[in-house]
Design a protein with these regions (language model features):
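A membrane-periplasm/extracellular boundary helix in multi-pass inner-membrane enzymes
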Residues: 213, 233-274, 453-459
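Alpha-helical transmembrane segments of multi-pass inner-membrane proteins
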Residues: 119-137, 161-213, 220-223
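TM-adjacent membrane-interface loops and short helices in multi-pass inner/ER membrane proteins
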Residues: 278, 283-311, 325-328
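Membrane-interfacial helix-loop-helix modules of multi-pass inner-membrane proteins that assemble, modify
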Residues: 126-163, 486, 493, 502-507
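Transmembrane alpha-helical segments and their membrane-water interfaces
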Residues: 83-126, 230, 235, 340-341
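Helix-loop-helix junctions and helix-breaking kinks within/between transmembrane helices
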Residues: 41-50, 89-96, 161-163, 194-233, ...
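Hydrophobic transmembrane alpha-helices and their immediate junctions
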Residues: 325-362, 543
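Transmembrane alpha-helices of multi-pass inner-membrane enzymes
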Residues: 358, 362, 373-415, 532-546
Length: 555
């Protein structure tokens, strides 16, 4: 390496080490990272969960206290926060408080910065959780369900509360990463590798996660997003202007979804209702039950005493019943205004991404509760918070709540530039993979084949599964069986029997001997072994080549 190139590389390395951030931004980063790790690892209760939430909200309170806001922003922050607290106390549900906290946190925070944090932290949490489940290191949540003509199969949640949640968690990961893609807009879409490769990687990842979750709603969420994004981006590359009719159509998707979800269950009658209810797996019937039995309240109601079988899967109904009418109207109006504002902005890759996310969110929220509950998977709340501060910025002079605190908030601190280091590492890995493509591809492929063969030969040999009845969606005619601890211990030692989440001798269990269930488990094991071992081996080879090249350069 020439001395000039070495100096340039050293300067790049030095700039990647640290950068300056204000205390206000650091407080936001701490809040957001804690929430991402907490929800990315699937925590839903317990002392760790409660402590982490308390620390995250303390960081957020500090961020708001030391920031500058105009009078309108202060009034809005106080009003919606107080309302969210009242809703929480009325319903016992933290979901609306989580949503409002993310919205109000977005002052002076760039969208790309938030998506960078989300991409790195959510991915790390997602991989850690799924790997721990694949290696059988934790409690394995699942649903046994008859799907796609295969008979009863195991739908794995891989650490999350439900297989649908797993698929949505992965799609959230895709949202974060695709927003950060830097396309080559000078090329047609089908010739732009910087765009096509990330899209293809996301497709492969989606199919892999779907192999475990068999979540049609989660898959549809991804397909709606990627179809909308590719369509909008192709039109942009072709030089097509976004017409008024197109803008209106996009803007109307959200309110139509809201109206269908909240009024549809009580307006539709007879056969029309029965058909839609069957298509949506009784979700409209549950919405109708809540509306006709409990009605709508201003601040939401506590439904914690209801059976787990009577839950609201529709996000809009969830917000209306748990958050109350006031917060429901505020968020629905804010979302509609934000979507209309977004479609009026300059057409760019990021703008198309935002629209695709909003369209996907609007449709998926009809059948899944992720948008306004405690899952922290609604990425569009970031866009909503950014929008509200943008449109309110011209109204009044920004001042701190307490003047002396603003000096603390504006104080800059030098901290490690994690994103720059990550990008630098990724570029070095890509360079090594390209430079040593044959050994990297050869070793990776060989490792993948060996891993798959080992998994297929020495993997699942079970021909029967015994699972908790509560985790199985079967017909009522299925006969429950009960086992003592001693009997279960004997069954666990039998390689032909798979015991899933046994609790005690009073817990009803079901037995399954569907051949397709165990063929599918073999296929999953083989593909997972090939994927993780192959990719891991390739990355290790790249790292080894980087170390060897670095040693040569020093000499």
């Amino acid at each position: 390496m020439s001395s000039m190139n070495r100096v340039t590389t050293e300067n790049q390395n030095e700039s990647a080490k640290k950068h300056s951030r204000t205390i206000e931004m650091i407080a936001f980063d701490a809040y957001f990272i804690i929430m991402l790790v907490l929800k990315g690892l699937g925590f839903t209760s317990g002392i760790v969960y409660q402590t982490a939430i308390a620390v995250a909200f303390l960081c957020l309170a500090c961020k708001i206290a030391i920031g500058k806001y105009n009078n309108i922003q202060k009034v809005v922050i106080l009003a919606v926060t107080i309302l969210a607290v009242f809703c929480w106390r009325s319903s016992g549900d933290l979901g609306t408080l989580f949503c409002i906290s993310l919205i109000v946190s977005m002052k002076n925070i760039g969208k790309e910065h938030v998506f960078r944090i989300g991409a790195v932290v959510w991915t790390a949490s997602f991989i850690a959780l799924t790997l721990s489940q694949l290696l059988n290191l934790g409690t394995r949540d699942f649903v046994i369900h008859s799907k796609f003509g295969l008979g009863y199969i195991i739908r794995w949640a891989l650490g999350y509360s439900h297989p649908n949640v797993l698929q949505i968690a992965y799609t959230t990961l895709v949202f974060y990463w695709m927003y950060l893609v830097h396309p080559d807009s000078s090329k047609p879409l089908h010739k732009d590798k910087k765009t096509i490769l990330p899209v293809l990687f996301s497709v492969v990842g989606t199919l892999y996660i779907f192999l475990y979750s068999f979540s049609t709603t989660g898959l549809l969420m991804y397909l709606i997003y990627i179809f909308t994004l590719v369509l909008l981006e192709k039109r942009r590359r072709d030089g097509a202007e976004r017409r008024e009719a197109e803008k209106l159509l996009i803007a109307l998707i959200f309110p139509v979804c809201v109206i269908l979800s909240t009024l549809g269950p009580v307006i539709l009658k007879g056969q029309a209702f029965d058909v839609i209810n069957q298509l949506m797996n009784t979700r409209p019937a549950l919405s109708r039950y809540y509306l006709t039995t409990y009605g709508v309240s201003l601040l939401g109601r506590d439904f914690s005493s209801l059976s787990a079988n009577i839950t609201l899967d529709c996000s809009y109904m969830y917000l209306l019943m748990h958050g109350g009418l006031l917060l429901f109207l505020i968020l629905v109006i804010a979302y509609f205004c934000m979507i209309k504002w977004t479609v009026d902005q300059k057409t760019t890759w990021k703008n198309n991404n935002e629209i695709a996310m909003l369209v996907s969110f609007s449709f998926t929220a009809i059948s899944e509760p992720f948008a306004f509950n405690t899952s922290f998977k609604n990425v569009t709340l970031i866009l909503l918070g950014y929008y509200l501060y943008q449109v309110s910025a011209p109204y009044g002079v920004e001042k701190a709540w307490i003047p002396i605190l603003s000096q603390i908030g504006e104080k800059e601190v030098s901290i490690p530039n994690t994103w720059a280091r990550f990008v630098q590492f990724k570029e070095r890995i890509c360079h090594a993979a390209k430079k040593y493509r044959f050994p990297v591809a050869g070793i990776g492929t060989a490792a993948a084949v060996i891993g798959m063969a080992a998994a297929l030969i020495g993997g699942y040999s079970a021909t029967r599964a015994i699972a908790r009845r509560i985790s199985c969606e079967t017909d009522l005619s299925s006969t429950s069986v009960y086992y003592t601890e001693k009997e279960i211990d004997a069954l666990r030692k039998d390689p032909e029997v798979l015991v899933l989440n046994y609790e005690d001798e009073d817990d009803p269990m079901l037995m399954f001997d569907n051949r397709n269930m165990f063929i599918l488990e073999k296929v999953r094991g083989g593909i997972s072994a090939a994927l993780w071992i192959g990719i891991g081996s390739s990355v290790l080879v790249c790292c080894a080549m980087i170390l060897i090249d670095s040693a040569k350069e020093k000499n």
